[in-house]
Amino acid sequence: MLHRVALASVIVFAVGAASVGRAQVATNWPSENPPRPLPSRPVSFPPYELRTLPNGMQVIVVMHHEQPEVTMRLLVRAGAAYDPPGKGGTASLVASLLNQGTATRSAREIADAIDSIGGALDAGAGSDVTSATVLVMKDSFDVGMNLLGDVIRRPAFAPEEIERQRTQTIQNLGVSLEDPDFIARAVLNRLIYGFHPYGFPDSGMPDTIAKITREDLREFHRRYFAPNNSILAIVGDVTADEAMGAATRVFGDWQRQAVQPPPLPEPPRPTRRIVVIDKPDSVQTAVRVGQLAIARKSPDYMSMDQAVRILGGEGSNRLFRVLRSERGLTYSASADLNPMLLAGDVTAETDTRTEASGEAVRVIVDEFTRLQRERIGDAELAGAQAYMTGSFPLTIETPGAIARQVVNVVFYDLSLDELRTYRQRANAVTPDDVLRVARAYVQPDRLSMVMVGDAARFKDQLGKVGFGNYELIPLSSLDLSAADLKKH
């Protein structure tokens, strides 16, 4: 997801991202229980074919004839983790420029071409991948494929477009770097991943973006954009022969090349680190807690996913019940498992009243501990599984949703049968499975914690709840590239 901190203006590939609203400054919310999930309705994954072109491009065709539309999603196995040293944001800048002019079309001509057929063309980059997606009606399928091939294979990286995108990205980052939620997530990533590329915002930072040259962008594209490093999903109202014919026509003469990923360090072992970012104008505290977890391909992924959903997933999760319903400390609370190619993390988050900051972070850590120590009840697990299986049809309801699912599965080198058997595999997880993975991967004594808010109003609480060994950093002194996170 590709869960990384990214700009709102860049559409980022993600395996599953959650958006959590900010807490309201209020107290004594009424206790409430969310509605029960609806019974699972029958659903079957549409027929598909997976083929490989002679040049090495993997092509997945999913025949989905419920609407007269087609989605094409092309994924390149290179994202922000492959950014050149000191030039974070390269992959994101490359992605933002794909539809801003090619060797044959200007940015305006691309926009006019897609608008004239009522379609959509988007591109973005995450930690592990760069992707582009085109959505068109069935009668414009060939036009959409031509546009996708053009922006992927022949981006112009025009100097004026580079500067326009650079300026916009830096301006957006300036806004984000004043947002407590963005700051908290960015700092937590650094605590979890250290100096591994996963520890830095995919979008880069203002100083790294300023260093990126046109040659850097062209070299990133030349080095990693290759058919044998790409996955193409074509989903919608097409036949396998139509789709494969179009893929061969547009991408068949794209030359295979050797692709050498840069060497990446192993993520560090989890260690506890508590950081308070002082932002005196804050009216509440952004609280983030997390640790290193498992990669997407782990055989324990399904069980771990359910453990984290019980902790803080959709519906009546434990964090929501304790923090909001029982204690009235926050408006919302959640936890997410964020798996990537080389590693992953589990994080919990909430925004709470300043005077409740210490209590909130204590509760979150205690719930991580309870997950590891206590076997969950059958009814609690059944509720989480009912939500997962009941909402699964929404993830394969449209061509665009299916395209995201299938490229994810192929990218992580999983079987497409994972989508066919999702419900059976989800329901097969037992309370003992959840306890086993929680004990194997959850380490409450090594959780990292970040709080962003008016430190003068809550820092004295931390020692009283067992977290007195914290680092205090004024927001104006924050430097994500420094080992101690401080400007010098």
Located regions from the model:
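An aromatic/glycine/proline-enriched structural segment found at the starts
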Residues: V25-R36, G194, Y198, D202, ...
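Conserved, carboxylate-rich catalytic/transport cores that coordinate ions
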Residues: H221
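Positively charged n-region of N-terminal signal peptides that target proteins for export
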Residues: M1-R4
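Mature N-terminal segment immediately following signal peptide/propeptide cleavage
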Residues: P35-V76
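Sec/Tat signal peptide C-region and signal peptidase I cleavage site
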Residues: S19-A23
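Bacterial N-terminal signal peptides
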Residues: A6-A17
